[in-house]
Amino acid sequence: MASNGAYPVLGPGVTVNPGTSLSVFTALPFATPSPGPTHRPPLVTAVVPPAGPLVLSAFPSTPLVAGQDGRGPSGAGASNVFVQMRTEVGPVKPPQAQTLILTQAPLVWQAPGTLCGGVMCPPPLLLAAAPGVPVTSAQVVGGTQACEGGWSHGLPLPPPPPAAQVAPIVSPGNAGPWPQGAHGEGSLAPSQAKARPDDSCKPKSVYENFRLWQHYKPLARRHLPQSPDTEALSCFLIPVLRSLARRKPTMTLEEGLWRAMREWQHTSNFDRMIFYEMAAKFLEFEAEEEMQIQKSQWMKGPQSLPPPAPPRLEPRGPPAPEVVKQPVYLPSKDGPKAPTACLPPPRPQRPAETKAHLPPPRPPRPAETKVPEEIPPEVVQEYVDIMEELLGSHPGDTGEPEGQREKGKVEQPQEEDGMTSDPGLLSYIDKLCSQEDFVTKVEAVIHPRFLEELLSPDPQMDFLALSQELEQEEGLTLAQLVEKRLLSLKEKGCGRAAPRHGTARLDSSPSEFAAGQEAAREVPDPQQRVSVETSPPQTAAQDPQGQGRVRTGMARSEDPAVLLGCQDSPRLKAVRPTSPPQDHRPTCPGLGTKDALGLPGESPVKESHGLAKGSSEETELPGMVYVVGSHHRLRPWRLSQSPVPSSGLLSPGGRGPQGALQSPSAQKRGLSPSPSPASKSKKRPLFGSPSPAEKTPHPGPGLRVSGEQSLAWGLGGPSQSQKRKGDPLASRRKKKRHCSQ
C-alpha cells in the first residue's frame, strides 16, 4: 500500500507527470519460477495523474523476472501486478482496482473497461530506460518533469500538443545496439518497431526539451544565482539528470543536482558551447511564445476576463516546422559521456549553499570572449618613443640661452638651440662670467640690436642674423666697432630727423631753411648718445686737460653753422625730446624754457644770477666759446635758422657742461638766462627725465616769432648795455683769448 508522506523516489522507466490531482500507486515485485535465485526489486512509489494513461517500461537495473544472467528467461510469460490507486486531493473515495500487466514485451497500463490489447498513449514527457546500455556518466535523475512536478512542490504543467504524446516502450529483453539518438532521447528499439504498429512513436521533439529547459531554469538559478550560465546549465541538466536516474534510481534530487553541478564545473568550454547554442535557441522560442501570448490577449480585448490560469499557447503554424527540424544537441552520440575530472574548471566554483533568489541574469552570449583585449606591446613602445621625442624637444626651448642672455653673454650659433652638453664648456663660461673684467668688456662690445630685441616684447628674435653680424665684428677692434655703430646710428638719425624738419612751423625764408638743413646734416642724431656712453672710456685720454666729458666719445664739431644752429633754437628745445649732439662737450645752450630766456618784464635778479653762474663755471670752457661769440656777433641771430634737432641734451636750468655753456652764450646774444630753483641744488643725469617745461611744450605764438622780432629782441635787450660797458664781460673775453692762444 502507498503511504501519503512517503518521499518520492523515482525508478527507471516510470512515467511521472504531476498535475493538480495526483494519485499514489505502489508497484509490488513478483517472482516467477526460475532456476536461478530470485532478486526482489525495491518498493517503487510514484506520483501519477488519474486522468492520463500510465505506461510503465521494464526495470532495466533490477528486472522483475530475473534469470541467471539478470534478465530472466526469454520465454517467460506475462505476470500481473495489482496496484491500489487512490486520490489525494478531494474527498476520499474507495480505491479503484486497476491491473498492471508486466511482460517481457512492451508493458501496457490497462484501466478497467479497456481492451487488453489496446495501447494507450503515454504522457508527453516519458523516459524509457534502455537495457543493455552501460550507464557510466551522471545523467538525469528520474523522469523528465519529475523534479519540477514531484520534487518542486507541484508546479503546473500545460497540456502537451498531440504530436508529442507518444513515448517509446522498451522491453528489458532488448540488448541490441541503439540507433542514432540513443540515451533514451526518443529512438526506438528494433524489437519495438517489429512488435506493433501502434507501439511505434515519433521521436521526442525539441519542444519537449524546451519545456524541460523551462522547468529546470529555477533549479539552475538557485545554484548559480548571479551567473550568466543559468540557461546553459538548464540545458545541461536535461541529459545529466536522466542518466543519473538510470544509474541510481534511489538518488534524491539534492544529490542529483550536486553531482550535476560538479559535472558542469569539470566540463570544458568546448563541450559547453553545445548547451550555450541550445539555450540561445530556447530563449528565442520563449520570446516568440511570449509574443504569441500577448497577441492572443490583445485579440481577446478587455471585454472578456482572462481565465485564472491561462494555459501557455504553443507555437503553431509556421514556427512549428522550424521547431521540429531543429536537432537536439547532446554531448555525444555513441553513448553517455564519462566525467572528465582531469580538466581544470574554467571559472572558480561558486558554493552550492547560495540559494538566494535574485533577478534572472541577462541571456548568455557564447560568442563573446570575457577576457579583456590587451594593447600590443609594439604599439605601447611606439607610443612611448613618440612621447619621449616630444618631451625631449621642449627643455631646449627654455634652457640655457635665457640665463645667458640675462648675464649679457653672446652665444655661438651652435648653442642657439640650448642643447649645449659639454660640461667643460659650461664650466669655462661660468668661470668667465664670474670675472668682472670679462663682463665689463662684454658689455662694452655688446650689440645694440641684441639689446633692442632682448628688451622688446616680441618673443621671436632673429638669432641667425645677429650671429652673422657678431661673426663679422669679431675681427674688428674696439675703435672700429665704435665707429661702425656711430655710423649706423647716424644713418638712423638722419632718417628720423627728416620728418622733424617738416614739422617745424617757422616763419623763415626758403634760403634760410635750406641753410638750416645743411647745418642739420652735420649734426648727429640724438640717439647716438646711447651707444656712445656704452663705449669704454678710452676717449678720456684724448682730453688730457679734463675739460671734455668722458661720456661723450665723438669728435668735436668745428662748423660754426652747427653751433649757431644749435644756439638759434631756444624755443624748439621745449618741443624736441631730450638728446644731446654728439661732441666731447655740448655746444648747444641749455635754453628751452621761458625761465632761461631774458624776456622783457622779468626781474633783474634772474639776470644777475645768470651772470654769476656763468662766471663761476667759466674755467671749464675751452676756447670754442670765443669762436661762438665772434660768429654770433658777425651774423644776426634769427629764430628761423633753427630746424636742427639740437634740444634735449640738457634740462632747462641744468648744471655741469650745460650750465657752463648756458650763461656765456646767452650773454653773447644779449640774453640773461636764469635757471630754475630746482636746478641749483643738484645736477641732472644725462638720461634723466625732462623737466615739466619740456614735457609740456608750448606750440603757441612763441614758435612763430619772425626774424625781425627776434633780431630786435636780441640786439635791443637790456644786456646790450652791459656789453657796451664791458664791465664784467670784457675782462672775461680777454682771459679766454689768452687761454685759447
Swiss-Prot record:
Residue spans of biased composition, Basic and acidic residues class: 402-412
A Pfam short name: NUT
Pro residues: bias regions: 304-321
Comp. bias intervals (Basic residues): 731-741
Annotated region described as Disordered, given as residue ranges: 172-200, 293-375, 391-424, 496-624, 638-741
Ranges annotated as biased composition (Low complexity): 639-650
Source superkingdom: Eukaryota
Signal peptide: none
Compositional bias per record (Polar residues), positions renumbered to this chain: 528-545
Similarity remark: Belongs to the NUT family.
Protein name: NUT family member 2G
Native source organism of the sequence: Homo sapiens (Human)
